[in-house]
Amino acid sequence: IKLERAIIKIQSVKSKLLTDNVGFIRISQFQERTADDVALAYTKLADQAPLKGVVLDLRNNPGGLLQAAIGVSAVFLPEHSLVVSTRGRTPENEKKYLAVLRDYAVGNESPDHIAQVPESAKSVPLVVLVNPASASASEIVAGALQDHKRATIMGTRSFGKGSVQTLIPLRVKNGETTGVNFTTARYYSPSGRTIQAKGITPNIAVDDTPEGNYPSFNLRESDLAHHIEVTDGKNEDAKAAKKETDDAGEEAFDEENAKVPTLRYMFGDDKDFPLEQAKNQLLGKKVITHAETQAKLKAEAKTAKEKAAKEAAQKEKAKAKTDAKGESK
């Protein structure tokens, strides 16, 4: 068998028009063409119907190119808006990235589809879905749209990969080259929030299913050994916010007889619970939040516990009655 080494290009953007004229755009990772593809996807959706809103799905998106993240943000933000900044120990690591062509351009491709996106993209109601597997570039986009109050972030707190790596080329013998990747800076959202080990906290916490969160989705940067910790005083409020969304659903799993989510779905299908809640948010309907899901699970666990205790008491009473009859004989 002959195998040829090659770069596998994946279609990173998928879109469709949902019921009630709500657009759905899913990004699986940030590649060279991702930003242009998002711009084209929005244009196509806007041509199909007068959009009542758009859901931008970044769940399970591990990140990718910084330029692509800036470009996707630029689709929905006014030109020249601050998207993200970096800070490090040296002046060359102090940078600001704006929603402009020079910061999101990848190569010399033309035309600039982002500049040609309909003006409605800057004002259409927008919900961004994230989960603990949304990392790096995904968090840059979510943080920018949240800080500019351009979108409502829904789901569970993101991964928290906010470190910047720089490749230092090294020359070895025989003319071969290699390199070492160093962490040199951190990413900060437009308002100055660090992403590192904190992630993006949703405006509205929503579980993966009506039965709670999938346990497998709850690993984050802050759970990894020797991760880069953040000690900025500015982020004390993030610690308080973390209590609400960190490991969402954990309390329910600690309850005796609590349910483990069994519902499995594909992102974007009709059983996608967070997507349904995102649609409800855009349409002004009732949203089932994390707090409500947990309250329901706790109530169900309490009811099940009381029922089991009642049944056990009845069995014990029946047994005592039987034993008493036996003794009387």
State where each predicted segment sits.
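C-terminal "post-core" interaction segments
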Residues: K2-E4, K9-K329
